[in-house]
Amino acid sequence: MTLPPTPIDIPESERTPLVKWLQEIVAGQQLLIEHQQSTIAKLEAKVSELEAKVTGLDEELKAAKKLKGKPQIRPSTLNQEQKQPKSGGKRPGSDKRSKKTDFVVDEELIIEPLDLPEGSRFNGYREYDVQDLILKRHNIRYLLAEYVTTEGRTITGKLPTQQQGHYGVTLRAFVLYQHHQCRVPQPLIVEQLREFGIEISAGQVNRLLMEEKASFHTEQQEVLQAGLETAEYVHTDDTSARHQGHNGYCTVIGNDLFAYFSSSDSKSRENYLRLLRGSHEDYVLNEYARSYLIAQQLPQCHLVKLQFSRASVAQGEAACLAYLQGLDITSLQAVKLLTEAALLGSAIEHGLSPDLIILSDGAKQFAILVHALCWVHMERGIRRLPGNTALQRQEIEAVQEALWDYYRQLRDYQDKPSESEKERLRLRFDEIFGQRYAHHYGLNLAMQQFCAHKDELLRVLDTPQVPLHTNAAEADIREYVTRRKISGGTRHADGRRVRDTFTGLKKTCRKLAYSFWQYLLSRLQGNNRIPYLPDVIRARMNQLRELAHSQ
């Protein structure tokens, strides 16, 4: 506020030295006040600017340190179908499957009526079907006939090949099914079998679950190999899996046809590449390894020491470290990058496609080959924003609405892809996520993240069959999480491997529409009633490709 001019015009004759001195003081004070007002206005503007910056940095710090605790996030609506109301007809869920479908009669019992009047004529039978289950002990005593030849040699009958130990195939399959399919802990299995009249100890149940499972381990490993060889994409995720009282991790790799689980003490990229390499032990520095090292910015002083070819440079981890030491490459970061590159090279040499799309939630260890990102996980970065003002909340809602609409357009594109629609969707992505908002640091940061990962989010435009989310991977890993809540961690290496193997085989059977119970019986009996799962995966993928080409 500017001070008014001097209110009194004092004649020159009355301007004594005192009056002049007072006038000078008043004029000086007026200039000082005007200067202070200007300074205050500048400081207020600066304070407003700094407050906005501090608020943005505070939001970023809270997100980085997770100071808010576990956020209460509502379920995403991105994948919910738009349900159209039905007019008339039956209520939802009222259509029941016929009980006569595939009904197999094991026993027929004829029931005659009581007090039948004399002279009644037989009119046929009225069917009444009952489903029941027989659970009882069935002990078998094999009498192995023994003969002595004329030469004095003894010949004895042989047990059936599927008979291993003193427990039959059905009982062994039942124990495996209860533990892995029904998630029944070992103590309850022991109690259950004893109530059925089976004489068995806790140690014997443990051995039935752990020992002589090499064929299952082999099949599960070949399921992974077949899945990686035939897949155009795989989804992946991991979760905690304690072992021997220490932290550990379980990683799942799969798609619509298979699931593979593997537990380890690390969730690093090196560990993930070991899974992709499978059961092989070699290290290969080929051209794909070279491209990986360049992308990861391996120093040139190390790069010039290497020779790249399709030949193996080492067999086993110790030999690989010795090879690098021989090249005078000893820094931890360089050894780490070269190990990852050699593992990647080995995996590709053994059949892994360099164009394989890996769909994940954004964890860095999965960002290899052709990486695709989950839209649902990216959308959470916007949904978590608090919105400190009404304007900020309005901006967040507008972005979410545009994002959901764009997501639905991507789903429509998956059904009917075209070049024109692909180009339009790329441009539309820039229109939505290229926007920036004044004084909304958190939203701008989220939009920058979308732009930085544009290619990974839009893999679907080049490969429409790739899902837009990792819901399937989370459903796979949830199987392991449920088991962990019931039984806790593992104590023995064999138990850890058995849990991984049978969890993967169970999920694979479910995806291929096979009964896990029939699968267990088939493998333990040694017949081919359930085909070899890796062969089924290859055959199914060939059928899908032929169908796609025919269309």
Language model feature labels by segment:
Residues 311-334, 350-368, 397-551:
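Acidic/histidine-rich catalytic cores and adjacent linkers
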Residues 170-182:
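Short, amphipathic alpha-helical "recognition" segments used to contact nucleic acids or chromatin
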Residues 181-192:
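Short, charged amphipathic recognition helices of the HTH superfamily
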Residues 1-166, 206, 236, 281-338:
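Short, flexible loop/hinge motifs at secondary-structure junctions
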Residues 22, 29, 50, 57, ...:
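Mobile genetic element proteins and their domesticated derivatives, centered on retroelements
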Residues 63, 195-198, 202, 207-360:
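RNase H-like nuclease fold core
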Residues 372-385:
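Inter-helix linker motif
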Residues 184, 212-215, 241-244, 267-271, ...:
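Flexible loop/turn segments at secondary-structure boundaries
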